[in-house]
C-alpha cells in the first residue's frame, strides 16, 4: 500500500506504483512514472518525462528531471530513465537528455549518489556505481559498471569512464579513464589500477592479467593504439579485451604520464 503525504502534489497523469512513499511538499509531474517500493522524501521534485524504477530511495530536496542546462534546449520531448535500487541523496540534481544527445539520460541500478551530485544531460551511468558528495558530471559523460567518482570532482563533457575505474576526490577530469584504472589530480592523470575495486569482484588470476596489460600499454613507449592491437592478438581475457578496446575507441584521449609507472 502506497503512503503519500496529503501535502505532496501529484499531478494528474503521474503513474505511481505499489508501496510507494512520497513525503510532504514533494512534486510529482504528470509525465512521471514511479516504480513499486520507491521512497521519495519530503521536498523532492520529480519533473518532466521521468521514469523511476523499483525500490529506489530518493532523499529530501532532490530535483530529478528538471530541464537540461543546455542553451540549445527548446522544450523538446526528452526523458530521464532511472533503474532500480538506487540511493539518491539530498540536494542532488538529475537532468534529462537533449535532442542533440539522443534525448535520454539513463541511470542503471544499485548506484549510490551522495549529496549535491549533479548529473547533466545525456549522461549514461551503468550499475553499482558510487558518486561521492558534489561529484559533477557534465553533459554526455558515460560511466561503466562499478565505477567510482570521488567527492568535489568535476567531469568534462563527453568523457568516458570505464568499468571498475576510479577518479579520486578533488580532481578534475577532462579525458577518458580506461576500465580498471585510477586517475587523480587537476587535470587528472592515471595513477595505476583501482586494485581495491578489482579485488571485490575479479579473480586474482584475472587481476594479474590486467596488471600485465596495463604495464604493457603504458610502458611500451609506442602509440597506445598500436600496443592495444598487439595485446588483442594474443589475449583471451575478457577484461584485458575490454581495456584494450576502450583504448582503441577513446575520442578524448587517455591522460597518462610514464613517470608514474
Swiss-Prot record:
UniProt main location, coarse: cytoplasm
Any GO MF annotation of the entry: acyl-[acyl-carrier-protein]-UDP-N-acetylglucosamine O-acyltransferase activity
EC code(s) of this entry: 2.3.1.129
GO cellular component term of the entry, any: cytoplasm
Record's subcellular location: Cytoplasm
Reaction(s) this enzyme catalyzes, per UniProt: a (3R)-hydroxyacyl-[ACP] + UDP-N-acetyl-alpha-D-glucosamine = a UDP-3-O-[(3R)-3-hydroxyacyl]-N-acetyl-alpha-D-glucosamine + holo-[ACP]
Record InterPro entries: Acetyltransf_C (IPR029098), Acetyltransf_C_sf (IPR037157), Hexapep (IPR001451), Hexapep_transf_CS (IPR018357), Lipid_A_LpxA (IPR010137), Trimer_LpxA-like_sf (IPR011004)
Pathway annotation from the record: Glycolipid biosynthesis; lipid IV(A) biosynthesis; lipid IV(A) from (3R)-3-hydroxytetradecanoyl-[acyl-carrier-protein] and UDP-N-acetyl-alpha-D-glucosamine: step 1/6
Keywords: Acyltransferase, Cytoplasm, Lipid A biosynthesis, Lipid biosynthesis, Lipid metabolism, Repeat, Transferase
UniProt entry tagged with the keyword Cell membrane: no
GO term, biological process aspect, one: lipid A biosynthetic process
Family matches, as Pfam families: Acetyltransf_11, Hexapep
Principal EC category: transferase
Highest taxon of source: Bacteria
Function statement: Involved in the biosynthesis of lipid A, a phosphorylated glycolipid that anchors the lipopolysaccharide to the outer membrane of the cell.
Subunit structure: Homotrimer.
Family: Belongs to the transferase hexapeptide repeat family. LpxA subfamily.
NCBIfam families: lipid_A_lpxA, PRK05289.1
PANTHER family associated with the record: ACYL-[ACYL-CARRIER-PROTEIN]--UDP-N-ACETYLGLUCOSAMINE O-ACYLTRANSFERASE (PTHR43480), ACYL-[ACYL-CARRIER-PROTEIN]--UDP-N-ACETYLGLUCOSAMINE O-ACYLTRANSFERASE, MITOCHONDRIAL-RELATED (PTHR43480:SF1)
Protein name: Acyl-[acyl-carrier-protein]--UDP-N-acetylglucosamine O-acyltransferase
Lineage: Bacteria, Pseudomonadati, Campylobacterota, Epsilonproteobacteria, Campylobacterales
Amino acid at each position: 500500500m502506497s503512503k503519500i503525504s496529503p501535502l505532496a502534489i501529484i499531478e494528474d497523469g503521474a503513474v505511481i506504483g505499489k508501496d510507494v512513499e512520497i513525503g510532504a511538499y514533494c512534486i510529482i509531474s504528470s509525465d512521471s512514472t514511479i516504480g513499486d517500493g520507491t521512497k521519495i522524501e519530503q521536498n523532492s521534485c520529480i519533473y518532466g518525462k521521468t521514469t523511476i524504477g523499483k525500490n529506489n530511495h530518493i532523499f529530501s530536496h532532490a530535483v530529478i528531471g528538471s530541464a537540461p542546462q543546455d542553451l540549445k534546449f527548446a522544450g523538446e520531448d526528452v526523458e530521464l530513465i532511472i533503474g532500480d535500487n538506487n540511493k539518491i541523496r539530498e540536494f542532488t540534481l538529475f537532468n534529462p537528455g537533449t535532442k542533440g544527445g539522443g534525448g535520454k539520460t539513463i541511470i542503471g541500478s544499485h548506484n549510490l549518489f551522495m549529496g549535491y551530485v549533479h548529473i547533466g544531460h545525456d549522461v549514461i551511468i551503468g550499475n553499482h556505481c558510487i558518486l561521492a558528495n558534489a561529484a559533477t558530471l557534465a553533459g554526455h559523460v558515460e560511466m561503466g559498471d562499478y565505477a567510482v567518482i570521488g567527492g568535489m570532482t568535476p567531469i568534462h563533457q563527453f568523457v568516458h569512464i570505464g568499468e571498475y575505474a576510479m577518479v579520486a576526490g578533488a580532481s578534475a577530469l577532462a579525458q577518458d579513464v580506461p576500465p580498471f584504472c585510477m586517475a587523480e589530480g587537476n587535470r587528472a592523470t592515471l595513477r595505476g589500477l583501482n586494485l581495491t575495486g578489482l579485488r571485490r569482484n575479479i579473480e586474482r588470476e584475472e587481476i594479474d592479467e590486467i596488471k600485465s596489460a596495463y604495464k604493457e600499454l603504458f610502458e611500451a613507449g609506442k602509440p597506445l593504439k598500436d600496443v592495444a592491437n598487439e595485446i588483442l592478438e594474443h589475449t583471451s581475457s575478457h577484461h584485458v579485451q575490454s581495456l584494450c578496446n576502450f583504448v582503441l575507441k577513446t575520442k578524448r584521449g587517455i591522460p597518462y604520464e610514464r613517470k608514474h609507472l
